[in-house]
Swiss-Prot record:
Main location: cytoplasm
Record note on domains: Consists of 3 domains; the N-terminus binds the ribosome, the middle domain has PPIase activity, while the C-terminus has intrinsic chaperone activity on its own.
Name assigned to this protein: Trigger factor
Catalytic reaction equation(s): [protein]-peptidylproline (omega=180) = [protein]-peptidylproline (omega=0)
An example Gene Ontology molecular-function term: protein folding chaperone
The organism of origin for this protein: Pediococcus pentosaceus (strain ATCC 25745 / CCUG 21536 / LMG 10740 / 183-1w)
Enzyme class: isomerase
Enzyme Commission number(s): 5.2.1.8
Keywords, comma-separated and alphabetical: Cell cycle, Cell division, Chaperone, Cytoplasm, Isomerase, Rotamase
A Pfam family the protein falls into: FKBP_C
Entry similarity comment: Belongs to the FKBP-type PPIase family. Tig subfamily.
Assigned GO CC terms: cytoplasm
Database matches in PROSITE patterns: FKBP_PPIASE
Record HAMAP family: Trigger_factor_Tig (MF_00303)
Amino acid sequence: MTAKWEKTGTNEGKLTFEVGTDKIKEGVDKAFDRTKKQLNVPGFRKGHVPRQIFNKMYGEEALYQDALNIVLPEAYEAAIKEAGIEPVDQPQVDVESMEKGEAWVLSAIVTVKPEVKLGEYKGVKVIKQSTRVTSKEVDEEIEKKREQQAELVLKEGKPAENGDTVTIDFDGSVDGVAFDGGKADNYDLVLGSNSFIPGFEDQLIGHNTDEDVDVNVTFPDDYQAEDLQGKDALFKVKIHEIKTKELPELDDEFAKDVDEDVDSLEDLKVKTKEEIKSRKIQAASDAKETEAVQAAVDNAEIAEIPEAMLNEDVDRQVNQYLANMQQQGISPEMYFQLTGSSEDQLRDQLREGAENRVKTTLVLEAIVEAEKIDPSDDEVAAEIKDLAEQYGMEEKAVRSALSEDMIKHDVAIKSAVELIKDSAIEEPKSKAAKK
C-alpha cells in the first residue's frame, strides 16, 4: 500500500492510495459470488453460472464497482493510517485508475482534524472561590426548610396576597374568541410564581373569595403560540378559595421534624452549615476546573473548526437533550409542541456553544498527546465499573456498548482535565480584578 497526502486547505487535502491486485482479486471474487445468486442464464440453474461464462457474457469489469465497494473501507483505513491523518467526515472518493491486471488508484478529498498549537495549560491563573458560610446563609436555608414544612390553610375574610394560593376558574378570549389552553376549572395558582402571562397574577391580588375578576393582559411577543403573540386578551376569573402558608414554629420540634438525626434547632443549624459548606467546596472545585480548562482553550491556537465537527457536536447534543426528555416521559413531538419550537430551533440554540465545546475537546486531546497520557488497564476497568454503577448495567454490557478505545479516550481526557485543574494557581478575586 502506498498512500500520498497533499494538503489543499486549512483542514482539507487529497489522499491518493492504491488497492493491490491481491485485494482486487478478493473483492472481485466476493462481488461475483454475490452477483451470480441473482443471475438467470440459459442452460444453468439460477445462481450457478460458471465464472468463465459470466466473464465471457458480461466481462470481469462488470464486477468492478461492487468489488470497489467491498475493498474500499479496508483500503481507506489503511491509507489514512499510513498517511497519519485523522478524518472528521466521510471522504469524497474518486477512481483515478482502474485497469485490469493493475493496482487500482483511488483518491479521496478528506476533511481532517485541525492542528492545535497549545499555549499555557499548566499553572493557569484562576479566581479562588470563597467557601465561607455566613450565618445569613444558614438562616436562609433554615427558612427554606420551614417553607417546605408549611401547610396551606384557608384564608377567610381577607384578600389574596402575594404568595397565597388561589383556586380559580378562568376563561380567556382574544377579541371575544376563545383560544386553545385559555380555559380551566379549579386551577391552583400561586400568586407571585410568574407561571402565568405577565400581569395576570398581579391583578388577582387584593380580591376575595367568590369574587369575579376581569383580568386584562397582553401576550408576550415571544409567546410559544405564534397566533397569540402580542395579542390583548381578557380572562374572566372566578376565585373559589384563597389559601395561605402557615409556617411551623422555629423550635426544637421543627428541627426534629425536618431531620430525625438532630435533637435541637441548634443541631440543625450546625448540620445545615456543614451541608452548605460541602456544596460550596464542590462548587468551588467545579468553578476552578471550568475556568482552568477554559483558560487552556483560550491560550491555544486553532485556525479553523471544520463544519463537519460542529454538525457532529450539535447532533450529539440534540440527541442527548431529547433522550433526557424521553427519560422524563416527554417524547420529542410532545416537547416541541409544549415549547412551541422545532428541532431546527433546538439545533440553532445548541449550536451557540458548539465551537467552544469542539475546541475544548481538541485542546484536551492535544494535551493528552503532549503529556503522553496513556490510561492503564486498571484505570479503564475502574471507569467501566463506574459507568456500570451509574447506569445500572452489568460491566459486560458496558464493554459491549462501548469500545475499549472509546473508554480509554474518555479516561485520558479526564486525566488531562485533572492535570490542568491541579496545576492551576488560585488567586483572590481582588488580585485578579487588578490585572
